[in-house]
Amino acid sequence: MSQDITVKVPATSANIGSGFDALGLALSLYNEVSFRKTDEGGLSLVVEGLGQGKITTDFERNLVGQAMLRAALVNGKALPENGVITLFNRIPLARGLGSSSAAVVGGLLLGNELTGRGMDENQILHEATLMEGHPDNAAPALLGGLCMSVTDEKKKVSVQTFALDEGLSFITVSPDKEVRTADARAVLPQTIDYHAAVFNVAHVAFLVGAFIGKRYDLLRTGLQDKLHMPY
């Protein structure tokens, strides 16, 4: 095992227009999670960049630390006894850019590297989905590009990934306050209108087609939504 390992994980945008809980894409803004082996001192965690002084450095309470421990458990091997894990965060917290997914995926990848690489991409995505509760941010954080994802009743995740046109640029607009995912979802209705469901099925087909076929004139139509944006 190398003495030093660094993992980069991108920001993600999910719930894209009509692709609520189904579509997510990776952005060119990255967090880094690194491990540096030491001879003593146990495992310590350092936070740099965004969230410094706010994100806990308690290894067992930090999302990255929890994900690393999960990877070690799945692989059946212990993490190194000594080392410094440094989180360098560029992704804003609680702004809809997948900061928690980046932490989970980064921790799983780093933990997997440190415990024998026993998990493949499918297993890492499965564990990330279990920790996050859904794959729409975790999938593009791990696989990149535009991802369509579904989870069946047995928690099995199926993903279709598409490479995006390198000439595309994305602009993100974030609120000047933190909005937790749980709070945002709390305003959604428990049931939806049949016609709203049909509307979204039709429009998400246009949205995916716009990206795949580079028909960006269809984006305005494909982004229309009746399941979450009105709320």
Spans of model-derived segments:
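Short glycine/threonine-rich catalytic loop with a Thr-x-Gly-x-Asp
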Residues: 95-101, 194-199
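ATP-binding N-lobe of GHMP and related small-molecule kinases
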Residues: 1-95, 113-119
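Short, basic/glycine-rich phosphate-binding loops at helix/coil junctions
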Residues: 45-47, 107, 217-223
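DPxDG-like acidic metal-binding loop motif
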Residues: 29, 97-120, 142-147
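Charged catalytic carboxylate motif
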Residues: 63, 106, 203
